[in-house]
């Protein structure tokens, strides 16, 4: 079993450009997107590290910041009772990042959801397509600049008003 200080030293030695920090007591690594598969694979495959479980992958939109987007990945090593958070900055002009779906099967649907909601493209993904929104949906609804439009839901207390104002043929 390794401790956090040892893990930090090994990450620094193996990946000198990775920025190391702390996030709620967990080790936080900010990695260039091109290095993501190598770092994630190394964390998974090193026998004494064994970060074998990807519990979460999600997107974040920092509208007004450059780079605008970020992908956050949480890995767990049950062997070491330790978590690592990976932060990968993704520019708006080229919102692509290598897939982790081939390394961690749990990344498959989470990458599809991040693509669907934020428009971040996971290159090399085996089936990157919308998972929550209809195929003909325009845009990505979790982006902070996505237009806020909605259709009011009809309930028994307001259905007469809703249906009277709908833009479809009336008798």
UniProtKB/Swiss-Prot annotation:
Predominant location category: membrane
Keyword terms of this UniProt record: Cell membrane, Membrane, NAD, Quinone, Translocase, Transport, Ubiquinone
One cellular component (GO) term of this entry: plasma membrane
Record keyword Repeat present: no
Similarity remark: Belongs to the complex I 30 kDa subunit family.
Role played: NDH-1 shuttles electrons from NADH, via FMN and iron-sulfur (Fe-S) centers, to quinones in the respiratory chain. The immediate electron acceptor for the enzyme in this species is believed to be ubiquinone. Couples the redox reaction to proton translocation (for every two electrons transferred, four hydrogen ions are translocated across the cytoplasmic membrane), and thus conserves the redox energy in a proton gradient.
Subunit structure and binding partners: NDH-1 is composed of 14 different subunits. Subunits NuoB, C, D, E, F, and G constitute the peripheral sector of the complex.
Protein's name according to its UniProt entry: NADH-quinone oxidoreductase subunit C
Lineage: Bacteria, Bacillati, Chloroflexota, Chloroflexia, Herpetosiphonales
């Amino acid at each position: 079993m390794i401790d956090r200080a040892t893990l930090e030293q090994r990450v620094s030695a193996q990946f000198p450009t990775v920025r190391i920090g702390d996030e709620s007591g967990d080790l936080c690594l900010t990695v260039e997107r091109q290095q993501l598969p190598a770092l994630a694979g190394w964390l998974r495959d090193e026998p004494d590290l064994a970060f074998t479980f990807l519990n979460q992958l999600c997107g974040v939109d920092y509208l007004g910041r450059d780079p605008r987007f970020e992908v956050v990945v949480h890995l767990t090593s049950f062997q070491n009772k330790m978590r690592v958070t990976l932060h990968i900055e993704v520019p708006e002009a080229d919102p692509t990042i290598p897939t982790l779906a081939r390394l961690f099967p749990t990344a498959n649907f989470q990458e599809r959801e991040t693509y669907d909601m934020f428009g971040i493209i996971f290159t090399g993904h085996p089936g990157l397509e919308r998972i929550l929104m209809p195929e003909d949906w325009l845009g990505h609804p979790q982006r902070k600049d996505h237009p806020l439009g909605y259709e009011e839901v009809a309930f028994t207390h307001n259905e007469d008003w809703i249906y009277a104002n709908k833009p479809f043929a009336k008798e």
